Design a protein with these regions (language model features):
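N-terminal nucleic-acid-engaging modules of covalent nucleotidyltransferase systems
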Residues: 1-245
Length: 245
């Protein structure tokens, strides 16, 4: 899947807060996905590049993001920060700059349109940024993100910038994703309990989704506790009275 397509789905998801609509949109997204990328898509929908329990953080604060955006779209850091204050969101500021530059620089727009990056390629670059360490880390992160942004359409730029900042607000939780996976592959939500059981054993939506898409619901049913993947804690049940506690 091209990341541009995922960006378009992000836009649709942002436009609604109704759970049934979110499930419908997500199920259509998942129908367009294959087994190799479905796990990555589930992480990206949560604003992540790995499960929540893994200490994989992109590690870029606003100042570094501003540097990367400025370098990608041929402006200066202060101009980026000013636009951010006007828009109230770094992603929107970056989208505006990308749109402005691609409108005036037709060769850049042609390059972006002719070779759109895939979801896997974008996820790989974000993981690369997250794994940088040691001397020169800041420059490596800024440079790599800048080069990535240059290759994306404006809508994709918006969402990629919001991911490291934790400002990707899609309103999608685990239950919504599980319902959508069942609907996409089975036509209804009846497989949700089986998917949820596997999720509870692994705390890893991407793993569950990939197993489901690659090997089917039978393989999901066989999911066991996995070393390194924590079990999700069960919610406490309310008792009728304090005496029964």
């Amino acid at each position: 899947m091209k990341f541009r397509t995922l960006g378009e789905y992000y836009e649709k998801l942002e436009a609604t807060s109704k759970r049934l609509e979110l499930i419908d949109i997500l199920s259509k997204l998942f129908k367009e996905s294959n087994a190799e990328e479905i796990g990555k898509i589930c992480y990206l929908l949560q604003g992540r590049v790995a499960p929540f329990f893994e200490p994989t953080e992109i590690g870029m604060a606003e100042a570094m993001i501003a540097q990367a955006v400025a370098r990608a779209f041929e402006t200066d850091k202060n101009s980026v920060l000013k636009l951010y204050r006007e828009k109230g969101n770094f992603g929107l500021a970056a989208q505006s700059l990308a749109d402005r530059l691609q409108t005036t620089d037709h060769s850049r727009k042609k390059a972006v349109d002719s070779s759109p990056l895939t979801v896997s390629e974008v996820c790989s670059k974000l993981l690369e940024i997250a794994n940088f360490s040691g001397e020169g880390t800041v420059e490596k992160k800024v440079g790599t993100l800048s080069e990535l942004l240059k290759k994306l359409d404006p809508v994709s730029v918006k969402h990629v910038v919001n991911i490291p900042l934790g400002t990707l607000r899609l309103g999608i939780g685990g239950p919504t994703v599980l319902d959508s996976l069942s609907l996409a592959k089975h036509g209804d939500k009846t497989l949700r309990p089986i998917l949820e059981d596997a999720y509870n054993k692994t705390s890893d939506l991407g793993f569950v989704a990939q197993t489901f898409f690659k090997s089917g619901i039978g393989a999901v049913k066989k999911t066991k506790l996995i070393v390194g993947k924590p079990v999700r804690p069960a919610l406490a049940e309310r008792l009728p009275s304090a005496e029964e506690a």
